[in-house]
């Protein structure tokens, strides 16, 4: 990694990876802290991405063999991507803590931890589907709405879990992350209730899905903490 000092030529600054704008060692320490904070944001993105893909594919696969049809429509898939994009982008400005030791990419451990969390998220959606089908008699066109709302709500709460290596309440998320999460929750509560572009559920059922998603997903913080500690994340 090339390092240029403040009085270096423009050519040297342009080719360097880091430019020290002040004298002394403090600026070097600050650069290391910033780089480790950036790594933590990237790690959160990777864990969230892997967990999301595992959960999404698992729900579609198990749901198809269970109900013998797609449990999420093409429009629902598009809306899910839309909801996830904003919260994913907001990770770039999230509040994170730098580590005291150098960071390394341990792909195996990251994948194993993400796989375990993804499987738990699959079970969460299946439980919500079971409750909706057998206790609230949700079938037909309403089932894809139920699955969509659960996946969207769970994705918003999931990022609040995986962004923090300790307990999820150990640090406050960034403002952009909180705003995007709140906005997505409100938007899809309205979509699910009024049925503007998707089949509607009653407001009570939408709130039930929101509550179950919050309960199950935030409950994942306990196995997440153990997994991250075990795999050195």
Where are these regions (language model features)?
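Short glycine-aspartate micro-motif
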Residues: 2
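Membrane-embedded transport module
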Residues: 5-167, 193-194
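C-terminal transmembrane module of polytopic membrane proteins
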Residues: 133, 137, 145-233
């Amino acid at each position: 990694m090339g390092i240029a000092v403040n009085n270096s030529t423009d050519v040297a600054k342009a080719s360097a990876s880091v430019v020290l704008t002040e004298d002394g060692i403090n600026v070097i320490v600050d650069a290391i802290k910033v780089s480790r904070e950036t790594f933590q944001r990237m790690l959160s993105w990777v864990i969230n991405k892997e967990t999301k893909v595992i959960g999404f594919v698992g729900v579609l696969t198990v749901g198809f063999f269970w109900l013998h049809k797609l449990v999420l429509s093409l429009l629902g898939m598009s809306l899910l991507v839309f909801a996830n994009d904003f919260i994913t982008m907001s990770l770039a400005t999230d509040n994170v803590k730098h580590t005291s030791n150098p960071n390394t990419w341990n792909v195996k451990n990251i994948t194993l931890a993400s796989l375990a969390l993804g499987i738990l998220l699959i079970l969460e959606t299946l439980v919500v589907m079971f409750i909706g089908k057998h206790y609230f008699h949700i079938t037909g066109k309403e089932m894809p709405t139920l699955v969509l709302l659960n996946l969207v709500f769970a994705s918003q709460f999931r990022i609040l879990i995986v962004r923090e290596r300790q307990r999820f309440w150990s640090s406050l998320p960034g403002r952009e992350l909180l705003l995007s999460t709140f906005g997505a929750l409100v938007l899809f509560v309205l979509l699910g209730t009024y049925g503007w572009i998707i089949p509607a559920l009653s407001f009570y059922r939408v709130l039930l899905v929101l509550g179950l998603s919050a309960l199950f997903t935030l409950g994942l913080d306990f196995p997440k903490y153990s997994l991250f500690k075990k795999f050195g994340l």
